[in-house]
Amino acid sequence: MLTIYAPFKNKKSKAWEVFNGVQKSWPEQVAVNDNTIATDPLSNSMFWGFVNNNLNLVRKLETRKHKFWFTDTPYFGRFDNNNLKPDNHYWRICKNKIHATYIKGCKADRFEKFGLKVKAPNFKGSYVLVCPSSAGINDYLDRPKWTEETIAQIKRYTDRPIKLRHKP
């Protein structure tokens, strides 16, 4: 059985775009619990980001070495929150981790369909762009001051201005 921990009070949350699809297609029985209620999580659980109690629930499952699924926004190809349709977005789903730790050998067409061109790094730009993760991710990684630490480290190697782009 899969147990989804979801925001019950916000059925318009993008998390439900994932969870509704999972409920329809998961090969086993699916139960949904409110992620605002502190509880002891069940093995084989699914979460969307680190909202509400999800961070604590994931940490408990990791400590016990129990299976969980972590879903969140993709690494690239953001979506339009005002125009979500079944065919115009995708999500990130990781098993027992919050990020993919390896890249499976897939055909190139899976990437090419996004129409993105990978550019070489520009080491001669006029500024350095820092794109920090959310506070929840930094807390999970035990790096609450990641942004400040990263900027301090960059300043050791360049005098170019540093610009921040927070998560949209």
Residue ranges and their predicted role:
Residues 1-3, 126-127, 161:
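Residues that mark the start of a beta-strand
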Residues 6-10, 131, 147-168:
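Catalytic donor nucleotide-activated moiety binding site of glycosyltransferases and closely related
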Residues 48, 70-73, 165:
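Generic beta-sheet signal
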Residues 53-58, 147:
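Short, well-ordered alpha-helical microsegments
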Residues 56-61, 153:
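A short acidic, amphipathic alpha-helical/loop segment
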Residues 71-143:
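A nucleotide-sugar donor-handling region in carbohydrate enzymes
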